[in-house]
């Protein structure tokens, strides 16, 4: 099975007025997704943020849990942070995976809409099981990534609909 990587994208993101913005880092972005990544054997979790002050905040929080007081207070959280990497762009995340794996990853994302390159979860699983190329699944914040960014990816995972839709 190919390696799975995930990333949480904070730029370029749309706000509710369809303006391009950068979203702020939240605690959930760091702690909870890092722990879920370890649980589900994700190869690496990328926190993707373009603003240096926000990356510095994330670095400070991560260091607290990796080597500061938090590392002895809650060792499980320390372990979760071993798979987290802070980068300033999607392109850097892709290059990092390429450096690790020796091949460019398949890049997929999620959206509530369908696109020409929308793929089912079953088909994406086949890629992971059979193709051998690593897969980077990106998740947007705010009101989602810009259309131009979405169109640059290999695949968009099909929307998940609830009972009321």
What residue ranges belong to the model's regions?
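RNA substrate-binding interface of SAM-dependent RNA methyltransferases
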Residues: 2-112
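Short glycine-rich anion-binding loops that position phosphate/pyrophosphate groups of nucleotides
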Residues: 112-115, 141-144
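Structured adenosyl-cofactor binding patch, chiefly the S-adenosyl-L-methionine
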Residues: 143-165
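Charged helix-capping and loop-helix junction motifs
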Residues: 121-125
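Helix-rich terminal scaffold detector
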Residues: 126-130, 145-146
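Loop/turn-to-beta-strand initiation segments
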Residues: 132-138
